[in-house]
Amino acid sequence: MILAVDIGNTTTEIGYIKDLDKIETLKFKTDHGKTIDDWLINFSFFLNFYNLDETNINKIYISSVVPQVEEKITKALEKLLNVNPLLIGTDVKVPLKINYENPSEVGADRILNAFASINILNPPLIAIDFGTAVTFDVVNKNSEYDGGLIFPGLESSVNCLFSKTAKLPKVKIEKPSNIVGKNTISSIQSGIYNGYISLVEGVISKIEDEYKCKFNIILTGGHGKIISESLNLQHVFEQYLPIKGIYFLDKY
């Protein structure tokens, strides 16, 4: 059985994969202050929550964009399961040609999303991940990673607005009932939500104009589903895209 760990800037998702139809996950806060023992407790909770036999776990893969946390998690897993985790990008290379000026700059999460996507949809395609940052990752018709775009995430935008203004409140991100807000909270919610809908549709249109072809679109990430509900273009929402990427990588 495979244990997959996706360490993001805000949350760390732990998942076990029996097959593509059997994926179970839990998310924990990516806290730089957590100790090795704190992470050991998180992983033990995960195993107990799903009633998993730790002796059945024979492979562990880690995708990480937070090196400081990655080191602690690696040691916690070695201590708990007596298995050496494999770090994607270092111990395991993703079989994807990267057309980037400096390929080492591309985060493991972005490459993993791109690799997972070409196992789900036909290229050319765009994988869009709505996390702490919103990332667009472009795979060309030859299944090569061409690069992408990076924006502040929805939550990051709300936090910035709240911290940089005197009177604007911090609001929950949700789909507004009307485009025009009737109070401060609904105005911010509409601005964030509808602004990102327009951002996604506009950027995709510009990419398709530049490449002179249509792209398949796949969405993932914490706010991917709520954006998916109003996106006015054909697309797929895949909740477990990074975790499935690890599955496909293991089977490659």
Curated annotation (Swiss-Prot):
CDD domains: ASKHA_NBD_PanK-III. One of its GO terms (biological process) is coenzyme A biosynthetic process. It catalyses: (R)-pantothenate + ATP = (R)-4'-phosphopantothenate + ADP + H(+). A monovalent cation. Ammonium or potassium. The keyword Glycoprotein does not apply. Belongs to the type III pantothenate kinase family. Homodimer. Keywords: ATP-binding, Coenzyme A biosynthesis, Cytoplasm, Kinase, Metal-binding, Nucleotide-binding, Potassium, Transferase. It is found in: Cytoplasm. Its EC number is 2.7.1.33. The keyword Cytoplasm applies. Its main location: cytoplasm. Transmembrane segments: none annotated. One of its GO terms (cellular component) is cytoplasm. ATP binds at residues 6-13, 132. InterPro entries: ATPase_NBD (IPR043129), Type_III_PanK (IPR004619). Pathway: Cofactor biosynthesis; coenzyme A biosynthesis; CoA from (R)-pantothenate: step 1/5. Substrate binds at residues 100, 107-110, 184. The active site is at residue 109. Catalyzes the phosphorylation of pantothenate (Pan), the first step in CoA biosynthesis. This is Type III pantothenate kinase. Its cofactor is NH4(+); K(+). K(+) binds at residue 129.
